[in-house]
Amino acid sequence: MSEVVVKEQLEQYISKIERLEQEKADLLEEIKNIFQDASSHGFDVKAMKSILKLKKLDKDKLAEQDAMLELYRDTLGI
C-alpha cells in the first residue's frame, strides 16, 4: 500500500470519527434539553433516567433485579 493511500485512509477515518463525535455531542445536548423540558413540566428526571436504564434490561434480568430489590426491602423493613 502506498503512503498516499494510507494517508487518505487515515484522513477518512479521522474525518468520520470527528463527524460522529460532533453528532454525539449534538445528541447529548438534545437529550439534556429534553430532560430540562420534562423537569420544567414537573417530571422527576432521576426517575426517568432510572426507567431508561430498566428498559434496557431484558425481561428476565429485570424480574431478577425486581425480586432482589423486593427481598432486600422486605429484609430491611422498607
From Swiss-Prot:
Pfam entry (one): GapR_DNA-bd
Domain of life: Bacteria
GO molecular function, one term: DNA binding
InterPro entries: GapR-like, GapR-like_DNA-bd
Family assignment from sequence similarity: Belongs to the UPF0335 family.
Name recorded for this polypeptide: UPF0335 protein A1E_00570
Source organism of this protein record: Rickettsia canadensis (strain McKiel)
Biological classification of the source: Bacteria, Pseudomonadati, Pseudomonadota, Alphaproteobacteria, Rickettsiales
